[in-house]
């Protein structure tokens, strides 16, 4: 029993060192999964001997240990194969080589640089889903050769393009529309663009009306003021993508404006482009300036240097989901955990491995060092979040260990 406990403690100590180092070496990731296999083997042996606890850790059933040991062997084999490829010198972190990400769609591939894609069903902002687009995907073929693919998104789903130029969809919006949509309609939002189904016009093209190119993607904040700022000699384009000659519209306007005596009224002065008047497109100077700073969607998001600069609490009267997120970005919320050092370290390891999406960053365990401090002794750990919604998700998803207290707070910056 003592020998088993000593070997188990040695494995745990090596795992904690890897967590503390937070290195991006592929060799360290291979060592990590080798230690996980040793850990599960010790769990399996202890359970077979009737031992239910090893230190502060509860021994899982043999079926669980066997399954996790096989997963560790699988990850070790894939990582050793990746180590022989041209991508071995790239940085590889623990989240990027985790089992959860490796099994996420597309399965059995390593993924980096995930980005959010929002899909709104039936034009209802409350009926929206978020998907992850992996910018970099690393996959191995039947010849044990590794390839790097890039991902893209269109109205049909999220895909990666293989070496032959074929699109391989790993997320299909139509499949989820059968579950979440009643009308079979959805809208894709990605990187300031809205991807919608093409709209065809019922008006036939004429000599003064021609169709504009149809695109599935268009800028999210495209304003009608850009159409009004066209010069007098160019075509104006309506909201459906059709272009219309200004001369024809003016001729119709002049033909309808007659004086009571039957003579034509004098034509109005030609339209002067906004660029020549010095005004911003779309109206007066003050209003146009405000629209350029904030954009049609609401307040402008903070720059990287402004994140965490507010000295007071976030505003609670922000209108709309985007405004709330922008308001909360200035004051990153945190949790202060207090408890035993080993318990906090184990909690950080388990949370980092199983729930990396529920928090922004997590500190090491620490204590107050000043002799004048009257606060009770004990180790502490800080958990930072992107916003209060993520902190709520963390508290609802992650189980706080017994004996660990939790306090809410916020910082001016991280």
Swiss-Prot record:
Family in the record: Belongs to the papillomaviridae E2 protein family.
Biological process per Gene Ontology, one example term: DNA replication
Full protein name: Regulatory protein E2
Signal found in the keyword field: no
Coiled-coil regions listed: none
Disulfides per UniProt: none
Assembly and interaction partners: Binds DNA as homodimer. Interacts with protein E1; this interaction greatly increases E1 DNA-binding activity. Interacts with protein L1; this interaction enhances E2-dependent replication and transcription activation. Interacts with protein L2; this interaction inhibits E2 transcriptional activity but not DNA replication function E2. Interacts with protein E7; this interaction inhibits E7 oncogenic activity. Interacts with host TAF1; this interaction modulates E2-dependent transcriptional regulation. Interacts with host BRD4; this interaction mediates E2 transcriptional activation function.
Record keywords: Activator, DNA replication, DNA-binding, Early protein, Host nucleus, Phosphoprotein, Repressor, Transcription, Transcription regulation
GO MF, one example: nucleotide binding
Region ranges (Disordered): 196-317
Comp. bias regions, Basic residues: 208-225
GO CC list: host cell nucleus
Cell compartment(s), UniProt: Host nucleus
Record's function text: Plays a role in the initiation of viral DNA replication. A dimer of E2 interacts with a dimer of E1 in order to improve specificity of E1 DNA binding activity. Once the complex recognizes and binds DNA at specific sites, the E2 dimer is removed from DNA. E2 also regulates viral transcription through binding to the E2RE response element (5'-ACCNNNNNNGGT-3') present in multiple copies in the regulatory regions of the viral genome. Activates or represses transcription depending on E2RE's position with regards to proximal promoter elements including the TATA-box.
Region ranges (Transactivation domain): 1-202
Main location per the UniProt record: host cell
Post-translational modification: Phosphorylated.
Region (DNA-binding domain): 331-414
Organism classification: Viruses, Monodnaviria, Shotokuvirae, Cossaviricota, Papovaviricetes
